[in-house]
Amino acid sequence: MQAIILAAGMGRRLGEYTADNTKCMLEVNGIRLIDRMLAQLFDLELERVVIVVGYEGDKLKNYILQNYPGKPIVFVENKVYDKTNNIYSLWLAREYMAESDTILLESDLIFEDNVLKSALTCKDRNVALISKYENWMDGTMVKIDENRNIINFVPKADFKYSDTESYYKTVNIYKFSKDFIVSHYLPFLDAYIRALGENEYYEQVLRVLTIIDKFGLKALPITGMNWYEIDDVQDLRIAETIFASPEERLKKIQNSYGGYWRYPKLLDFCYL
């Protein structure tokens, strides 16, 4: 089992926080996202970690090489990170991906340790980690049946508030078997890029595959586990509260500006 981390994006919405560093170099409560993620991955005793770099890639590579000497880490460079999207970053890592069972994840995530452990211990060989829709969630959604089969990927453009009861958010963590990668995912990934270009999302390939074979990819709900995706400054602030101690969480929320309604699972009665 290996891991592939997609870390080529520019993180424009974070403004000055990513002016000279990629998103995974951000600190949440004093710990960089990439340090937290690598610690969690190495705790699983994976054979290697493949990191696709792009924006400020040299800084990220130098930081990792300096702080993780001797660790089985491989770098792949996306030189056109400003003109492509994550589908191309994953395509660049296709040769590594074809060699082993793979955990695929994005570098702007923060999550508790049990999230990855649940993926590895799940008996299903090909799974997408999901979380029941909440109003703070954005991006790709899925619909599942009673047997946890993913029956549809719903891109952001097709999102409907009337359907939110049936939506689950993709956590952007996947576990794929080598067989699935070689026989299904990579051939369709290559065909999709040839047909629609490199400025797309890798989830679109999964959407096509679920249309063809709805039993190929299972959903794994991570109910009750903490996770967050950091796309902007508000996300960063929320992540800092989620992954703080109860005492520190209260202080951070009380010292913030604006209504408490922005924070997940927190009721704000000031408008009542």
Predicted regions and their residues:
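Conserved N-terminal catalytic core of the sugar/cofactor nucleotidyltransferase
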Residues: 2-5, 31-100
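N-terminal nucleotide-binding beta1-loop-alpha1 segment
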Residues: 1-19
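Catalytic beta-strand/loop signature of glycosyltransferases that borders the donor
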Residues: 168, 217-225
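Catalytic donor-sugar/metal-binding loop of nucleotide-sugar-dependent glycosyltransferases
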Residues: 207-220
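N-terminal "arm"/small-domain region of PLP-dependent enzymes with the aminotransferase-like
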Residues: 247-272
